[in-house]
Amino acid sequence: MKILVLNSGSSSIKFKFFDNKIIKASGLVEKIGEQNSKVILKNVLNNESFERELTINNHEEGLSIVNELFKESGILADLNTLDGCGHRIVHGGRNLSEHCLVDDYVLKEIDRVSIFAPLHNPAHLAGIKTMIKAAPSVANVAIFDTAFHRTMPDFAYMYALPYDFYDKHNIRRYGFHGTSHAFVSSRAASLLEKDKSELNVISAHLGNGASVCAIEKGKSVDTSMGFTPLEGLVMGTRCGDLDPAILPFISHLKGLTIEEIDTLMNKKSGVYGICGYNDFRDIEREIEQGNDKARLALDMFCYRLVKYIGAYFAVLPKTDAIVFTGGIGENDSLVRQKVCERLAHLGIELDFELNKQRISGERMINHANSKVKVLVIPTDEELEIARITEELIGKN
């Protein structure tokens, strides 16, 4: 099947094109709504690139240029020849708990729950509507970041607030990075030559946004992110878990509005708030130069991660493997080492030489004596979206 995967942002469209699950092209429409917009399409098979620089006023114009570049490159004759298009959607809310084909109800529901993800869902919706207009005969599939976590039990996803907040306003823990956690847990099963239903995995997706997921027999039973992606780990610019009583205190102390506090927690906190950097390469360079705030930021990040992984050892009946993924999880050997050393009493023994090797691809980095496998698996959310899109179109 020919599947296009779209990740639509407020001023951008990222895309990948798969033919029978093999990536053929990838690209980006950036600076939508600006005069210096750019469209880039790369033929993955021969590294040939096709670019246009022009004014792109909206998503519809951007996708039209993408279609032109597909034709020019010879990769795809027309968007209408696709078998399907998979759309990454951050938040499905309470009612859209599973990936699904797009229809009028789905469009209305994605719009309705935009209040939960105001920076993401409206842009995703624009991407879907643009695709429907550009290629009306092509099936569109909505792939929700929240869907993988639909298997969490109620005692894991509920907040201890008055029940009406859940019943009437759908306030609960939803979890995110679901497509990534689903992908790497499946790959872990393949690497360990086991069926997903036989395996318990703790997946750590570590990027500028970061989350941990406890996966029992292929199903999410708990995850660190909650109602929004702000809960949980210390992240690049997000604070993660916080005593909620701090918020009214800060408001009175600094005279900040709710919106300003939201910006503070999401964009000015995390390791950036501690040391002024959110790129871990910069943080580790600063540590080498004696920057104690950088050292503190790294220690806080790793300590919170250790606490969550340790908690999920308690949640799962048995832990077979820990998976590191995301930009930091895949590339930062120091973070992996600091985390695994603190978890040694749980049967985790890292092979330090394997951990330090700067190689790409899936690999096992635990010592042969380790009771728990430690894996590094590069995530591929677009491939997972393409796979699910094919599966749902095939069923219908």
Swiss-Prot record:
Quickly give the catalysed reaction.
acetate + ATP = acetyl phosphate + ADP
Which of this chain's residues are annotated to bind ATP? K14, H205, L206, G207, N208, G209, D279, F280, R281, G327, I328, G329, E330, N331
What role does this protein play?
Catalyzes the formation of acetyl phosphate from acetate and ATP. Can also catalyze the reverse reaction.
Which PANTHER family does the UniProt entry name for this protein? ACETATE KINASE, ACETATE KINASE-RELATED
Compartments (UniProt record): Cytoplasm
- How is the co-factor bound, per the entry? Mg(2+). Can also accept Mn(2+).
How it assembles, according to the record, is: Homodimer.
Active site per the UniProt annotation: D145 (proton donor/acceptor)
Quote the PROSITE patterns the UniProt record gives: ACETATE_KINASE_1 (PS01075), ACETATE_KINASE_2 (PS01076)
Query: Which cofactors go with this protein?
Result: Mg(2+); Mn(2+)
Q: Which HAMAP family match?
A: Acetate_kinase
One Gene Ontology term of the biological-process aspect is: acetate metabolic process
Q: Specify the taxonomic lineage.
A: Bacteria, Pseudomonadati, Campylobacterota, Epsilonproteobacteria, Campylobacterales
Q: Mind listing the UniProt keywords for this protein, alphabetically?
A: ATP-binding, Cytoplasm, Kinase, Magnesium, Metal-binding, Nucleotide-binding, Transferase
**Which named protein is this?**
Acetate kinase
In which domain of life is the source organism classified? Answer: Bacteria
Q: Kindly give the Pfam families that the UniProt entry links to this protein.
A: Acetate_kinase
Keyword Kinase among record annotations = yes
> CDD domains annotated for this entry?
ASKHA_NBD_AcK_PK
Name the protein family: Belongs to the acetokinase family.
**Enzyme Commission number, as recorded:** 2.7.2.1
Give binding positions for Mg(2+): N7, E381
Q: Name one GO molecular function term.
A: magnesium ion binding
The organism named in the record is Campylobacter jejuni subsp. doylei (strain ATCC BAA-1458 / RM4099 / 269.97)
User: At which positions is substrate bound?
Assistant: R88
Q: In which pathway does it act?
A: Metabolic intermediate biosynthesis; acetyl-CoA biosynthesis; acetyl-CoA from acetate: step 1/2
